[in-house]
Each structure stands twice: as structure tokens, then as C-alpha cells.
Design a protein with these regions (language model features):
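Ubiquitin-like/PB1-type beta-grasp interaction modules and other compact soluble beta-rich domains
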Residues: 1-89
Length: 90
């Protein structure tokens, strides 16, 4: 199974400067956990201490926004994820 997670430049220092990391998993959450297993330094950049997605992390699965309560959504071979931080200000 090949699922790709696209890593933004500001998180690449935590993935050994990899822009794309291939992961395995049957759900979005499992794929994110596999990312953390391969790149442990990114863990606290996307999850809080309870293992919940940080509220400023945004995930897109094949171009579709995934809400924090949809992490159990199925993932399949060929999927591509994009991670982003949501920035605010005024």
C-alpha cells in the first residue's frame, strides 16, 4: 500500500527534510500515526499529548478537507494527504 503525505516546508525539518513521506494505514488517523512512527519528531507538531489532532492542523485527503472528527475516514492505496497549519491574525 502506498499512501503519500505531503509535508509543508515548515514541517520538513521534522521529516529529515522529506517533502513527501509514504505511509500505511487503513484510516486517516492510522496514516498519521504511521507518519509519526517514521518521523517521531513531527508527533508533537500535529498531535497533542492525548493523541488528538492539534486544532491548527489542517488535513486534506485527495483535495477534500478532513475535519478532526473524521480521522476514522478510510484511507486506501494511492491516496495523497496534504498537511497544513491554519494561520490566523488580523
Amino acid at each position: 500500500m502506498s499512501i503519500k503525505i505531503h509535508i509543508p516546508s515548515y514541517l520538513q525539518p521534522f521529516t529529515s527534510d522529506e517533502a513527501i513521506v509514504e505511509v500505511n494505514g487503513s484510516t486517516v488517523y492510522e496514516c498519521l500515526n504511521d507518519l509519526v512512527e517514521h518521523c517521531p519528531d513531527i508527533g508533537d507538531k500535529i498531535f497533542d499529548k492525548e493523541g488528538e489532532l492539534l486544532n491548527y492542523v489542517s488535513i486534506y485527503l485527495d483535495g477534500e478537507f478532513i475535519y478532526a472528527d473524521e480521522l476514522d475516514k478510510p484511507a486506501k492505496d494511492g491516496n495523497e494527504f496534504h498537511l497544513f497549519y491554519i494561520l490566523g491574525g488580523g
